[in-house]
């Protein structure tokens, strides 16, 4: 089995606590590099104190990403302020609420949140609150910057892994 764009392979049961593949399985992760993203935000916004994050309360991957941000926040002098949503209908009010509390917003690879990005991007732009993307395409859509995922590159990497397995050059369980 080869997976692609799984945010937290450990949470999904694909790798053990030491990061080793469980069984004959491997793949790629789209976990945001929280430490590097916060470093970028600090460089671009030296006076910022509070970083906002929207997340779906129904996505386990979002909780893993938030934990990574919270772990790295102190190093850069940030407080992470989260705002959960359960459906697209929640986003307008959630955006109004979070934007009032933060200096900027950073995205996760949360499907529900990203599918509603235009809603909060418009509100954030009006309030002059920068939004940092979680992947390259989001910058093209209006986010100010990102140290994030390029899903095309991630797909190519996963495809190369699959090709090696199919050609008998490697076993999934031995790949990282």
Regions found by a protein language model. Give the residues of each.
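Short beta-strand-centered segments that line the small-molecule binding cleft or hinge
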Residues: 1-18, 121, 126
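Hinge/beta->alpha junction and helix N-cap segments in small-molecule ligand-binding domains
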Residues: 28-35, 55-65, 82-91, 110-111, ...
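An alpha-beta-alpha
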Residues: 26-74, 171-176
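Hydrophobic alpha-helical segments within soluble ligand-binding/sensing domains
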Residues: 8-48, 149-170
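Hydrophobic alpha-helical
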Residues: 86-141
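Glycine-rich, charge-decorated loop segments at or immediately adjacent to ligand/cofactor-binding or catalytic sites
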Residues: 12-19, 91-93, 139-148
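Short beta-strand elements of ligand-binding domains
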Residues: 1-10, 27-29, 130-136
């Amino acid at each position: 089995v080869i997976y692609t764009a799984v945010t937290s392979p450990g949470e999904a049961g694909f790798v053990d606590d030491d990061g080793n593949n469980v069984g004959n399985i491997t793949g790629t992760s789209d976990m945001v590099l929280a430490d590097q993203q916060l470093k970028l935000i600090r460089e671009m916004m030296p006076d910022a104190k509070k970083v906002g994050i929207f997340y779906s309360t129904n996505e386990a991957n979002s909780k893993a990403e938030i934990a990574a941000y919270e772990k790295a926040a102190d190093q850069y002098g940030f407080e992470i302020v989260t705002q959960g949503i359960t459906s697209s209908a929640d986003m307008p009010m959630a955006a109004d609420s979070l934007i009032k509390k933060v200096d900027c917003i950073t995205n996760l690879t949360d499907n529900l949140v990203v599918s509603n990005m235009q809603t909060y991007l418009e509100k954030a732009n009006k309030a002059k609150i920068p939004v940092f993307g979680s992947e390259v395409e989001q910058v093209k859509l209006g986010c100010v910057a990102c140290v994030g995922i390029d899903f095309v590159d991630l797909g190519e990497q996963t495809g190369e892994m699959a090709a090696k397995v199919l050609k008998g050059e490697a076993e999934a369980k031995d790949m990282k």
